[in-house]
Amino acid sequence: MTKKELMQFATDLKKAEEYAARYRNTEDGGTCNFDAPAVKLKATEAQIEKVCKPAMKWWKRDPQDGKTWFVLFGAKRDGQGNRNTRMAEAISKKLAAFSYETTVYYEMD
């Protein structure tokens, strides 16, 4: 990925987080979880560190289905149950609308 593409991703991620904020005041029952959006980027960890880390708190490389995914644990979400899941899904959905390949990483606590 070029620096310009990475900067665009950082911008798109902020927009996706703003989109997910609509779920901030919803119920938060259900199982406590670590659900987080994930995105496939053609970038190295060094590129992510330089360009996108200010927009993110944590990045995790995780092989899934033979592909490299960055799990966005630091994406802005609230809650620890259903609300967290809804916000993670909303971020993933919005990034997909921006033409990124996305999924949601689901993990119960």
Where do the language-model regions lie?
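Charged, low-complexity intrinsically disordered segments
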Residues: 40, 45, 69, 105-108
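A short alpha-helix capping/helix-coil boundary motif
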Residues: 64-65, 69-72
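N-terminal leader/targeting segments
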Residues: 1-65
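Short, compact, well-ordered microdomains
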Residues: 71-109
